[in-house]
Amino acid sequence: MKLIIFTGLVLFAIVSLIEAEEESGRACILLYGECTKATGSCCSNLIYDCYRKLKKGVQIARQCFCSEKDVIYKKDI
């Protein structure tokens, strides 16, 4: 009986810690990570760049990625 109560208390403590960790804040998104739904979640040394996906001139999607500050990417032809 004591073992069952102890096991229940341990499981309750683990679940509480997991929930508290989730509420306290998520980890930042690393370099080249997709941040379309959370543009403000890039790590502090990164910025987010967003791109529009066009099909026949009509926007069909938008994607954002965390990238390095002061770095410019150009399309290679």
Curated annotation (Swiss-Prot):
State the tissue distribution.
Expressed by the venom gland.
Q: GO cellular component terms?
A: extracellular region
Compartment(s) where it occurs, according to its Swiss-Prot or TrEMBL record: Secreted
Q: Which UniProt keywords apply?
A: Disulfide bond, Secreted, Signal, Toxin
Q: Name one GO molecular function term.
A: toxin activity
Has UniProt tagged this entry with the keyword Transit peptide?
A: no
Describe the processing and modification events after translation: Contains 4 disulfide bonds.
Question: According to the UniProt entry, where is the signal peptide?
Answer: 1-20
| Propeptide section residues | 21-26
Record bears the keyword Signal: yes
Among InterPro entries, the record links this protein to:
Spider_toxin_CSTX_knottin
Similarity-based family: Belongs to the neurotoxin 19 (CSTX) family. 10 (U11-Lctx) subfamily.
Protein name as it appears in the record: U11-lycotoxin-Ls1c
Specify the taxonomic lineage.
Eukaryota, Metazoa, Ecdysozoa, Arthropoda, Chelicerata
